[in-house]
Each structure stands twice: as C-alpha cells, then as structure tokens.
C-alpha cells in the first residue's frame, strides 16, 4: 500500500531539487520560446492522475484489455471535444507527439520513395517535413518549397514545383513562419497534381481554435498537431482527417507505430480542448497576436530586422546580422538576463544550424502570465538593450532586475 504522505520531496529529494529549481526558473524568467507555454493546474491534475495506471491498447469500445469502461469515456470525451473544436470529421488523440502524428499520416498513405513537398527547414519548416536528418527525409523523396525575396511563401512557385515533381503528399505548416498560410490555395495545388494535402498546425493550433488564424481542417485531407504550444495542453499529439481515412489512420497509430495510449495524457488533452472552447481562450489568443506584433514592431524600431517584415501570428524571427551577433551568442547573452529565446536559422542563413544568424521569439507564454502590449513592448526593449550591449555586465544586471520586477508582478500560477 502506498502512503499519500510520501510525496516526491520525501521519496526522492535529489530529483525534487531539480523540479523545484525548474519551477523557480519558470517563475522568474521571461519565456519567449515560441513552442513553450504554461499548462493550467487542471491539465496538470489530469496528467498526474491515477489514469496513468491503466493500460488500454486499442480504441474506445475495442480494447485488448478489460477494465477500460472508464478510460473509454475519457478518450471518447477527448475525441468529441477535439472534433467540435476544429470542425473535424475524424480525430485521433493517441499520438504521443506531433512527430508521431506526422509519421502516422505518412505511413497511412505513402510508400518509401514517394515524393513529398514540404517547407524548406532553413526557411521555417520543420524537421519532420522532410529534413535529411529526420526519418521523413530518409524514407521519402523530398522536394522542398520556400520563401521568395520578400520572405513570403511563393504559391505560384509552389504550384510550378508541384506540377513538375507530382508529389504524393503536400505538407503545409512550419516551425518558424510568422505570416498566414493560404490553406485554400495549397489545397487547390494539391488537387491539381493529385496529391494528398496535410497540414501540421502544431504552432498555430491555439490560434486556430480561437478563430484568429485560418483553419486548415475544411481544406486538408489530414491535419496534425501537438497539444502544447499555443493550444496550452500537455505534451502530446493529435490527428484530424476526413472520415474516409479513419480506418487507415487508426491502424497506423495502433498497432503500427505505438502500443498502449497514455490515458493520463489523453485526459489532460481533453481538459485542454475544453479550455480552448471557452470565451476567455479566444481573448487570450487575441492578446497573443497583439503581443507578438508589439514586440516585433518595437524591435524593428530599435534597429533590428524582422524576417518577413513582421508577424501575423504568435512568432517571428529576428535577423541579428546588423548587430554583428549570431543566434547562439544572443541566446546566451539574453539567458544571462533571464530572458529565454532560442537561436534559429533565417532564410538563406550563412551560419550553421548550431550557430545561426537569428533568434526566434514567441508570445504565448508571456501572454499566459498576463502580459499585454505595454509589457510586451518593455520586454522587446529589454531584448534590444542586451543586443546593443551584449558584453556589458552592468546592462545585463540591470536588465535582469527589470525582468524579475516584471515576473514578480505577473506570476505564472496565482492563488
């Protein structure tokens, strides 16, 4: 029998010190990594529940184990909420990650050697959309599309490439593209060449759920996503699709790619989908857009170049070359002041992916804390102060003090 009095701090103090240190870091630092966010206490409560004890291979009503009547209810609730949230015909909430959700789609409609079009990783795409370092780039013939001289997607060029290479699958979505995608145009291109159309909306899912960014579900054959990032749920993945793909996708997830689903994580996904359907979530996402736009414009006013000229989403890239800095260096200097960003390649970057010429900045986490335009502008000015004086210890110390003043005013988790 387990004693509930024996909590983690008692059972494993060595681990607990790291958990507490990370909690303090999240409390005190300004988080600007676009793929990170804070989950609600309800999401964490679901993920830390006794549902973690239950094995449930299969799907609701079709399990390989007994005792699944209650976890069936959990998973069906998550499926129903997800379908309603995005207007989908079919949904699968079992993928453990966005990468596995993408793999499930690939393996349901592609064969090794098939041609796939996805956004160039160096122009803002994602590893799983055909990078040579990823399984997708090793199994399939990848033909990338990218940005034009204005650092916008060139749909005419995309169509020209598609007509030439005749892909089996066209992929939309990105990890570092600030502007809006034209899903309808991409669907039309896919239709012209007889390709399936898949959208990986991982970065934009929360914005889409709130109706402040275009919804790909009516246009795409398949839509995948993570459940964290802007959606503010637990770490995990999901798939939505036309109803005709239900059987092939279900079998592609289980038993082809995964075994038992993580029922405690699926429960947390269900909570996140419920939260995303509330009016306050729409207000949150509207503020995410305002904060990102404010930061981009403020940094531009301080002499920094914003890739694509600005942002229409939660994220944007900053070209550091005018400052004579690399992304790796800027990441480190800002980190000393307790501002967390990530180095990121910019289009046609002369530096390696481990160094880069840019940084990626996102507004989801600071908006969850309650930051509005005034605070977003202050954060951007703090970033610019560091980038203007990266080796000045007095500037770093003064900036860190201002960061702590901000974060103390806006705690992540209140009473």
From Swiss-Prot:
> Which catalysed reactions does the entry list for this protein?
(6R)-5,10-methylene-5,6,7,8-tetrahydrofolate + glycine + H2O = (6S)-5,6,7,8-tetrahydrofolate + L-serine
Which keywords appear in this protein's UniProt record, sorted alphabetically?
Amino-acid biosynthesis, Cytoplasm, One-carbon metabolism, Pyridoxal phosphate, Transferase
Name the residues that bind (6S)-5,6,7,8-tetrahydrofolate.
121, 125-127, 352-354
Q: In which pathway does it act?
A: One-carbon metabolism; tetrahydrofolate interconversion; Amino-acid biosynthesis; glycine biosynthesis; glycine from L-serine: step 1/1
Subunit description: Homodimer.
Q: Briefly state the protein's biological role.
A: Catalyzes the reversible interconversion of serine and glycine with tetrahydrofolate (THF) serving as the one-carbon carrier. This reaction serves as the major source of one-carbon groups required for the biosynthesis of purines, thymidylate, methionine, and other important biomolecules. Also exhibits THF-independent aldolase activity toward beta-hydroxyamino acids, producing glycine and aldehydes, via a retro-aldol mechanism.
Q: What is this protein called?
A: Serine hydroxymethyltransferase
Gene that encodes it: glyA
């Amino acid at each position: 029998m387990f004693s509930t009095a024996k909590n983690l701090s008692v059972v494993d103090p060595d681990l607990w010190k790291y958990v507490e240190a990370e909690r303090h870091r999240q409390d005190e630092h300004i988080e600007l990594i676009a793929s990170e966010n804070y989950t609600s206490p309800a999401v964490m409560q679901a993920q830390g529940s006794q549902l973690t004890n239950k094995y449930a291979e299969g799907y609701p009503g079709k399990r390989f184990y007994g005792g699944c009547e209650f976890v069936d209810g959990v998973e069906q609730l998550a499926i129903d909420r997800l379908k309603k949230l995005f207007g989908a015909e079919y949904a699968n909430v079992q993928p453990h990650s966005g990468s596995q959700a993408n793999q499930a789609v690939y393996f349901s409609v592609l064969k090794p050697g098939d041609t796939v079009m996805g956004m160039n990783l160096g122009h803002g795409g994602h590893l799983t959309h055909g990078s040579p370092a990823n399984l997708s780039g090793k199994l399939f013939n990848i033909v990338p599309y990218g940005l034009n001289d204005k650092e916008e997607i060139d749909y005419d060029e995309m169509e020209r490439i598609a007509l030439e290479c005749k892909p089996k699958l066209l992929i939309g979505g990105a990890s570092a593209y600030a502007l809006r995608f034209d899903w309808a145009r991409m669907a039309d291109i896919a239709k012209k060449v007889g390709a399936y159309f898949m959208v990986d909306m991982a970065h934009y899912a929360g914005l889409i759920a709130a109706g402040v960014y275009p919804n790909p579900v009516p246009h795409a054959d398949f839509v995948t996503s993570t459940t964290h990032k802007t959606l503010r749920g637990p770490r995990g993945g999901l798939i939505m699709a036309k109803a005709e793909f239900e059987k092939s996708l279900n079998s592609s997830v289980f038993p082809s790619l995964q075994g038992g689903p993580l029922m405690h994580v699926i429960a947390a996904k269900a909570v996140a989908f419920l939260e995303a359907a509330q009016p306050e979530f729409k207000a949150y996402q509207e503020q995410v857009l305002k904060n990102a736009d404010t930061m981009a414009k403020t940094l531009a006013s301080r002499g920094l170049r914003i890739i694509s000229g600005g942002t229409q989403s939660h994220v944007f890239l900053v070209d550091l070359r005018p400052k004579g800095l690399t992304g790796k260096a800027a990441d480190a200097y800002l980190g000393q002041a307790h501002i967390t960003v990530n180095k990121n390649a910019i289009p046609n970057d002369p530096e390696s992916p481990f160094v880069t010429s840019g940084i990626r900045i996102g507004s989801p986490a600071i908006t969850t804390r309650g930051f509005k335009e005034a605070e977003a502008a202050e954060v951007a000015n703090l970033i610019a102060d560091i980038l203007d004086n990266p080796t000045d210890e007095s500037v770093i110390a003064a900036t860190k003090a201002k960061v702590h003043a901000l974060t103390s005013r806006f705690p992540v988790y209140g009473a």
